[in-house]
Amino acid sequence: MNILIVEARYHPDVADGLMDGATAALEMGMARFERVSVPGVLEIPAAIAIAARASRPFDGYVALGSVTGPAHIAQTFYAETMRALTALSSSGLALGQGIVLAGDEGAARDLAITHDIGGDAARACLSLVILGQRLGLSQVEND
């Protein structure tokens, strides 16, 4: 399996915690992966859409990032990101999401690590890739 991790690095400590969990889960699942970074969560869906149209597509995608700040702003960023990620998933992409919504960066970091949100996102992606392969819907040919 070849997986693309798209991470928003707006909060570097949170991103590192999410990435640690995701890479550990992908390594445990014996998946190959590449990692690309974008500035914030709103860019994650666009990056995945671009990658899905590339000449060498991936079997699945993992979206990692965090949203903090005043509730009304953070909730809007989170909702719009999730809406776009859900649309990508509904189009048939195997996509695991690990987007953390919290009041501040410290709380986001704690959530990311204690709940292994990055690992959960990677495991969700892998399970969807496996489902697609079982049903004959693999995104790419396996080597």
Predicted regions mapped to residue ranges:
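Active-site rim loops that border cofactor/substrate pockets in soluble metabolic enzymes
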Residues: 28-55
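Glycine-rich phosphate/diphosphate-binding loop of Rossmann-like nucleotide-binding domains
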Residues: 1-35
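Short, ordered loop/turn segments at secondary-structure junctions
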Residues: 9-10, 38, 66-67, 99-105
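Glycine-rich phosphate-binding loop
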Residues: 47-85
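A charged, well-structured terminal subsegment
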Residues: 115-143
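Phosphate/ribose-phosphate-bearing ligand recognition and processing surfaces
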Residues: 71-74, 78, 105-114, 126, ...
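Short, acidic/small-residue loops that bind anionic groups at enzyme active sites
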Residues: 76-102
